[in-house]
């Protein structure tokens, strides 16, 4: 029998718990009891496993022992962080009634729900990463996708047209929590993600969504946000907003707009491309040796998060890019002065979100005050920068002198963590608070005077006056002198070596002091809440200021990186093409212990495809990736690692570089490779940058070469994308002779005996050999195996000396001339014994052979 079914048999307190738990059946309930949050039944069992805490039992209710686990209330943030990191959600239930006046159990209420996508507490968030709540919706026309960063108020929606685009969006945004409809069809897209939340269909209803959003923004329609004609995106956004309100249990004033993200506004990169380019995460899942690790020397967490958003969404609007370039150029002489001041601003963006949610702690307000104190110096430094965009940022960041003055008067220099600890509001801010504090603080002087007086009166030299939280004020006398205690001393507590007493005068003073402390704390909490009321009317301007400060941090950082790492400003041109002089890989050049060999690149409508050959470890993949990374950096407005760069319009970047078996989906390396290749061939355009590395490796030589040839042909002749095509099939070096717009380049190496030296320098023309055996020897393959391989190589070369030669009949190569399969009719004839056939059987065979031809 379940606890709910046997409800009346439980104690009143457990009945209260079960009612609250029934409202939140799928998540853990932290039920406040004194100094602990308790969990019962299945919640206790789950929590003990997830948090590695003891599972105990609490007496019995309805005749059964109740499984129980508990955590101290003062350490709750640490436990919440562990649960959130595991994708769990928690309902926090607090005591809101007064135990002294309560009849029966103290009144309790769920005051907030902590979920992976709706956290705003500093202790639970990764400070340099966005933490997104997302919702996904699907109908016959495509997908709707919405994301909300509750720690900043940034609200976005999009309408991915197909599965590949939706997968790329999920990879880019990487939500901490994802809401989906109960009838969502493409479960394979989202399976395996943490923080999945199944929601009822009605939460995605379009009319409800419009109503919710208009109510949130105080508008009559959504035309002004540019999302009116995005029904799928709005369905997702409506569900997401409702969920955020339900979990926060408060208004969300910092969410004041919603933005549509359109494919045509940014360079599209699919999930494979983001992974292969190692933008913010390397192939092993870490953050080391990524593009972000090189570019991100921002000095504020909000600046770091903005830079990563830029890296994952390169913009195509050249006006925005030229403005960023101009700003970076103007700031290069000011980075040393600006960065130390910007560092002091801190994470104003997330502090403002906690202010809006009314969960900001005293130290948040102290940090906000410290940020305001930096603004006059920042504005003074920026005043001399000759740049219109910089001056626009300067105006947007504001000064907030009144708010700075308010917080300087209201909050002490170093406040405690929590307002309930008291001592947050500064002396002199409120006269009544100062009076109550004076009364409470006067206790020390009074107790000292009382102790001296009573010692003199009683003649007891061991007498002393003290206080503890359990018994309050007391007079303590040692056990040896306790028999001499005056008659008006009433025993309060007996210790091993002493007795503690109370006298009417001390009891009266205790009541007075405790009353004054309680009143001081209650007034302090009230004044603290009133500070929110004084700050929140300025929320919109404060959010604009935080955004401007984050952008300034990013641009100052990019200016510093450009100067320190010797980057150059790229030039944007109107026609498709990329021309790079002395290009370098931004990450590899930082980790090498030797000088990086810079290389040129020239792609244009007349030279659309480069067939890249050369040895393994020769630098082909590095050369290809550096081209994509230089293009990506140019399209966030950054300077780039090269001597000179001219770059035309790019709509998408595709990479087919390396692969591993996708065991979870049951796909082989070759299947993964072909899936990515199919995506490229379906979606690339003449404005796309395509990197193709070693297509066709996972199958037979003939199949692989055939596929590689056909893919290259399609990209060069039909799609006409800007393509870097690395291959070990030397037969493909014949392509430039057969198609216009295709050229050969190679990376060379020098062999000397058993050693090989890689030149890492890109040269025109095809490579002369692949150096595969030399690389194998370098890798430590046994000498006898290498020796045998050389013998076999000579045999094969003597058998087919012209394997790569072109045949007379047009574009077909000899290696592609796969022997025809034997006809079934021929096989049948070969197996036939004519001497054993009767005339009738012979006639039947003639008809059978006829059917096989």
UniProtKB/Swiss-Prot annotation:
One Gene Ontology cellular component: cytosol
Amino acids binding ATP: 614-621
Keyword check for Signal: no
One annotated GO biological process: mismatch repair
Stretches of the chain forming a coiled coil according to its record: none
Keyword entries, A-Z: ATP-binding, DNA damage, DNA repair, DNA-binding, Nucleotide-binding
Source domain of life: Bacteria
One GO molecular-function entry: ATP binding
Reported function: This protein is involved in the repair of mismatches in DNA. It is possible that it carries out the mismatch recognition step. This protein has a weak ATPase activity.
Family: Belongs to the DNA mismatch repair MutS family.
NCBIfam families in UniProt: mutS1 (TIGR01070), PRK05399.1 (NF003810)
Protein name (record): DNA mismatch repair protein MutS
Species of provenance: Shigella flexneri
Origin organism lineage: Bacteria, Pseudomonadati, Pseudomonadota, Gammaproteobacteria, Enterobacterales
Gene that this sequence comes from: mutS
């Amino acid at each position: 029998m379940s606890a709910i079914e046997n409800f009346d048999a439980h104690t009143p307190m457990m009945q209260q718990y079960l009612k609250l738990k029934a409202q939140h059946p799928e998540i853990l309930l932290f039920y406040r009891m004194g100094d602990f949050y308790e969990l019962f039944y299945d919640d206790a069992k789950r929590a003990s496993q997830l948090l590695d805490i003891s599972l105990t039992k609490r007496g019995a209710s309805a005749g059964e022992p109740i499984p129980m686990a508990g955590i101290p209330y003062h350490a709750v943030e640490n436990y919440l962080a562990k649960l959130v990191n595991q994708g769990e959600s928690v309902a926090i239930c607090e005591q809101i009634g007064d135990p002294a006046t309560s009849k029966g159990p103290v009144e309790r209420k769920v005051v907030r729900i902590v979920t992976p996508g709706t956290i705003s507490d500093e202790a639970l968030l990764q400070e340099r990463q966005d933490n997104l709540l997302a919702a996904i919706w699907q109908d016959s026309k495509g997908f709707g996708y919405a994301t909300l960063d509750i720690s900043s108020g940034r609200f976005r929606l999009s309408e991915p047209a197909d599965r590949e685009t939706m997968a790329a969006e999920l990879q880019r945004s990487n939500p901490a929590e994802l809401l989906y409809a109960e009838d969502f069809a493409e479960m394979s897209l989202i399976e395996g993600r943490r923080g999945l939340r199944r929601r009822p269909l009605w939460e995605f209803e379009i009319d409800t969504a419009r109503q919710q959003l208009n109510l949130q923004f105080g508008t009559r329609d959504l035309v002004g946000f540019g999302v009116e004609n995005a029904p799928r995106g709005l369905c997702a956004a409506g569900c997401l907003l409702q969920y955020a309100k339900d979990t926060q249990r408060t208004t969300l004033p910092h969410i004041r707009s919603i933005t549509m993200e359109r494919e045509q506004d940014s360079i599209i990169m699919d999930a494979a491309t983001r992974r292969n380019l190692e933008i913010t995460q390397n192939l092993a899942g870490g953050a080391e040796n990524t593009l972000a690790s090189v570019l991100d020397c921002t000095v504020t967490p909000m600046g770091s998060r903005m830079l990563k958003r830029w890296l994952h969404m390169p913009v195509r609007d050249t006006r925005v890019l030229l403005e960023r370039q101009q700003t970076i150029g103007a700031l290069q002489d000011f980075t040393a002065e600006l960065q130390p001041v910007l560092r002091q601003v801190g994470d104003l963006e997330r502090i403002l979100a906690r202010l809006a949610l009314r969960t900001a702690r005293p130290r948040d307000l102290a940090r906000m005050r410290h940020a305001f104190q930096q603004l006059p110096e920042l504005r003074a430094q920026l005043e001399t920068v000759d740049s219109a965009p910089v001056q626009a940022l300067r105006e947007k960041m504001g000064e907030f002198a009144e708010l700075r003055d308010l917080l300087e008067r209201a909050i002490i220099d170093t406040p405690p963590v929590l307002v309930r600890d008291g001592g947050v509001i500064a002396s002199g801010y409120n006269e009544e608070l100062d009076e109550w504090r004076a009364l409470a603080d006067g206790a020390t002087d009074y107790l000292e005077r009382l102790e001296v007086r009573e010692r003199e009166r009683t003649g007891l030299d061991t007498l002393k006056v003290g206080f503890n939280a359990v018994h309050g004020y007391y007079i303590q006398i040692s056990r040896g002198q306790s028999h001499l205690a005056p008659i008006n001393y009433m025993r309060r507590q007996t210790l091993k070596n002493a007795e503690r007493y109370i006298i009417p005068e001390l009891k009266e003073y205790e009541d007075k002091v405790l009353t004054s402390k309680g009143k001081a704390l209650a007034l302090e909490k009230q004044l603290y809440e009133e500070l929110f009321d004084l700050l929140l009317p300025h929320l919109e301007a404060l959010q604009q200021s935080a955004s401007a400060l984050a952008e300034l941090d990013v641009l100052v950082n990019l200016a510093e990186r450009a100067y320190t790492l010797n980057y150059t400003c790229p030039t944007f041109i109107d026609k498709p093409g990329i021309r790079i002089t002395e290009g370098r890989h931004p990450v590899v050049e930082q980790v090498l212990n030797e000088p990086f060999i810079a290389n040129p690149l020239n792609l244009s409508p007349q030279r659309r495809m480069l067939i890249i050959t050369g040895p393994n470890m020769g630098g082909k993949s590095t050369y290809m990736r550096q081209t994509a990374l230089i293009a990506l950096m140019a399209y966030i407005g950054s300077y780039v690692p090269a001597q000179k760069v001219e770059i035309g319009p790019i709509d998408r970047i595709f990479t087919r570089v390396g692969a591993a078996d996708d065991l979870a989906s049951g796909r082989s390396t070759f299947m993964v490779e072909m899936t990515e290749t199919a995506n490229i061939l379906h979606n690339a355009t003449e404005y796309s940058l395509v990197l193709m590395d070693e297509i066709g490796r996972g199958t037979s030589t003939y199949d692989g070469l055939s596929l590689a040839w056909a893919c290259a042909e399609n990209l060069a002749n039909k799609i006409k994308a800007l393509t870097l095509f690395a291959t070990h099939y030397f037969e493909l070096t014949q392509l430039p002779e057969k198609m216009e717009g295709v050229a050969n380049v190679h990376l060379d190496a020098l062999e000397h005996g058993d050693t090989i030296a890689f030149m890492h320098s890109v040269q025109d023309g095809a490579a002369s050999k692949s150096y595969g055996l030399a690389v194998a020897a370098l890798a430590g393959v046994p000498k006898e195996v290498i020796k045998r391989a050389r013998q076999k190589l000579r045999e094969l070369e003597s058998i087919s000396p012209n394997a790569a030669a072109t045949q007379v009949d047009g574009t077909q190569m000899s290696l592609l001339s796969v022997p025809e399969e034997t006809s079934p009719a021929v096989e049948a004839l070969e197996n036939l014994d004519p001497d054993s056939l009767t005339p009738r059987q012979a006639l039947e065979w003639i008809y059978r052979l006829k059917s096989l031809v």
